[in-house]
Amino acid sequence: MVAPPECHRPIASALSFSASFMFPAVPDAHPIPYLERGTRAYWRASIALLFAGYATFSLLYCVQPLLPSFSAAFNVTPAESSLSLSLTTAALALAVFIAGFVSEGWSRHKLMTLSLMASALLTIGVSIAPQWHQLLVLRTLEGLALGGVPAVAMAYLAEEVHPEGLGLAMGLYVGGTAIGGMAGRVITGVVADLFSWRIAIGTIGVLGILSTLAFRALLPPSHHFVPRRGLGFNHHRTALLKQFTRPGLPLLFLLGFVLMGSFVTLYNYIGYRLLAPPYRLSQAEIGAIFVVYLAGVIASPLSGRMADTFGRARVLIGSLALMALGLALTLLHPLTAIALGIACVTFGFFAGHSVASGWVGRLAREAKGQAAALYLLAYYLGSSLVGSYGGHVWAGYGWNGVAGLVGVLLVIGLAAALRLRGLRARERTAA
């Protein structure tokens, strides 16, 4: 580990400036080093956050393949069954926003550990819930608990990791979310077929507890985080509004909305197309699409390395272009072309999200937790709003309409990424 170079000193200076209001200034003869790529502490932090990403998304999405089982077990309609996921994601969107404020005054390590453990225990509670409304309450609480991880994880990495290794570390975290998103769907489906949906959800809960224990054991303590307790509403409002004045951050928030909105909308409705003629795939065959999430496991760390080498804007533009290519392939009739298109969209999404989320932490010089929370709020709003609206588009215009909707979003995203590249070029010229 080494002391931060010139490019990282503005972040350390901002944190020191914030802390100076609460702590007297003292000489700093031995500045605390950042986690540098290749060191043992760096890999401990990266692997710990991979476990956190896995646990978060496996706990979140484990119910998705079980919606028909819920309909049969509790005698509810498919729309009512889907509340077991939509209520959780809605609560998560709210919670990540609140967590950005709370995390400024509490230990990031403890907050993430508590959130993961509470979510895993609530998942076990879901597996034994005797009534439908109790299951929904537990899933909503789970979404609120999970909100303590995503924004805080992004802020932790931005504060503790050396800038030259931030892309890879963020990529490993996002790769963990990809593994979790796939495992949460695939494991529950397989276990439910072999035993029951209750055992399937309980299994995910137990795996979540084990992942939390591994996370807690591996994650190095924060050295560059300065807790700020007792901050009033006016402070948080000012800090929140300040994020929109930092050049580039609003564009990254927009990209979070575009990336997740496009990705979820495609995954929500491609199944309807494949169930219909001429494909007539079974639910099990369509479920195999979730294995494409493995593309995200590869894309996230790879895009991080590429961003560290070639620049974030170039990788973002390439990721969005790959998503557009994949979307075009889904308009073709051969099933192999559609499958390849879904893989391209998945790879591009995880690569783009990895780069954009890491970039937020680099640009937010103060209140990193709040900046990360704003990004994730936009991210989950994209999932909720565009994903829901896509259903109306599907009903009226079929897959061509859905592809058109996603295509418009990707054009907006490309415009934002090009604008970011222009901002970075002007900053280098001014320097």
Could you describe each region identified by the protein language model?
Residues N75, S107, I128-Q134, L332-H333:
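Helix-breaking motifs and short loop linkers at transmembrane-helix boundaries and internal kinks
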Residues A313-A356:
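C-terminal transmembrane helical hairpin of 12-TM major facilitator-type secondary transporters
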